[in-house]
């Protein structure tokens, strides 16, 4: 079949065959991909702070122990202690704390890495039935139990969010276009593209860290954007131009190839900027996002036309909701352009002032779930025995230095207690008075410790522990923000300049998105929501994803010579639905139990909602002003 313009028939058979082969290869490659739910996995095993902690763990039996905690005045039978101690993954029963009126504590060191989910998971699964068969009420705490529980909760949250995103996107599309089956058809290239991208990612990284694990859910909303624009363009060609289904599909493909490619490249560019981060969590998010975005793009431009050509024509020619209201909106925008611009400037000024007082969350533990049983038990132990749940660790090369350090009577006021670790020479636990996971508190206590060590003229020492890892994440976070944001913006501008063949238009398209981010920062400040590592992750994502609507709007603006009614008739509904699906994909994380995922979803959804508003209302005003200015210069 050849259309009136001489466009050749779509190669459905070879494209479908290639897709099947690639899908089978990807499925085989994905078999070894693991999920890493450890929050400190955001640093990566090659980070100096992690390497120090791991090296300390190798020479320190029981540094990361499995703790069995029994209710006050309840004890663990000696036979059950021996049963746990005899497990192949348990190295030794290292210590026991039993005090009247307090919880009984039994510590077991592991033969492998206690922070490795695969090893810790085996241990926890073996110990769980032993504890459930006891008459005493006991539970597990410590690093192994926490890692397993966090991992399982994360896995459950991601599956739940994925299902919710699928349902929301399907319902949204079915409601707007009134054809549910077409929504399911759209998911085929998106799902295959996600699989291809994850398979490519697994060739580079063996595991998905906390942020990278959210990519499949995000790309449902992002990837389906291409499908929606293609379907809307087909509807426009059938209804307005009178083309047949086959001609409409091929015409839409050629007409949208450039804007879809540019929009995809802006998303890939954003993820590439994140991939350059020093923080492993951001880098993994960037690598996974770049691969998956590319996979979804390739699947959509190759497989989607074949799917649409197989659909009944009535699926593409029916009426859609909100078509007429959007066309009416175009007339209102034309009349109210100055008022819209004034309102945008006023909102931006207020938001900028409020954003100047935005707090930053330095206690990364507040991004973790508080209802995790292992963490509850760990906190109870700390309160009952007067110990910090996560002390700072100091390892002196000379064990005599550790003895002198602990014997010093002029202890800093920021330090509550000092304890040595049984049978580990030179290792001291520092229990601060204030929460060491808050940046200012950690810096204060470490400064006091350094002054104390200098005053005593002690030898070489190493600082480690969970608070030190938290401080390292904090340090890299602020460094990456200053680097990633300008890089992402620069790459997006380059892509837009290449795709639009203009130098000024990319700044016009990107400006409303910057305003949207300022509005969100101002809203967070006014509502008391602090910025965090999560906020830093969504900013470049919103720039790369939110710009897609502006790309399609500016392309349609050029095709229709600034006729806003015609622009909205062709692509206005698609812009609304695509950004709405992205909002639904991010918003699906709000149902998660993990505060980090909830914040990730809520903040990104709010920013994209701002993108939708400025793209529909403000961007046409800016484009109209730019067109008028160019006409004036021409005269």
PLM ranges: what are they?
Residues 71-72:
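Generic low-complexity, intrinsically disordered segments
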Residues 57-58, 96, 140-143:
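Short, surface-exposed recognition loops or helix-turn segments adjacent to catalytic cores
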Residues 47, 87, 279, 371-372, ...:
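Serine-centered coil/turn micro-motif
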Residues 39, 48-53, 59-66, 75-76, ...:
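Juxtamembrane segments of multi-pass membrane proteins
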Residues 81-137, 373-496, 513:
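Structured non-transmembrane domains adjacent to transmembrane bundles in polytopic membrane proteins
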Residues 1-37, 115-118, 122-363, 456-635:
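Membrane-embedded transmembrane helical bundles of large multi-pass transporters/channels
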